């Protein structure tokens, strides 16, 4: 069974999830418009698998850009999909565009290693 991925319905819910996370948060921003939808659905699968693999080291949050516009602006996200690694309420790394499992794993390993 895949580890649960949080899906906030509004900015305040995103902030709540962020405040309750015991460590780093992978916020991946998605969109529902036609050009973004296929890549975002593919990222759902990739993030789901890695959330299971990383377990308690990481909290995954699927962030709909339309439902969480303040969060989207706060982290400087301009397109979907975009992955943002957040620690202590600050973005420590971001990567725009779809990623394979290997690419996302490399992104996480690099930046989680920098966090200690």
Q: Can you annotate each of these PLM segments?
A:
Residues 23-26, 69, 75-84:
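Structural micro-motif
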Residues 16-17, 71-74, 107:
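CheY-like receiver
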Residues 37-41:
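Conserved phosphotransfer microenvironments
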Residues 6-10, 29-31, 43-44, 48-70:
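Thiol-based oxidoreductase modules, predominantly thioredoxin-like and allied folds used
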Residues 18-19, 52, 112:
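Residue-level signal for alpha-helix termini/capping positions
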Residues 1-17:
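N-terminal "domain-start" segment that seeds a small globular fold
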Residues 20-35:
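Short active-site neighborhood of thiol/selenol oxidoreductases, capturing the structured segment around
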Residues 79, 84-116:
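Non-catalytic, surface beta->alpha helical segment in thiol-disulfide oxidoreductase systems
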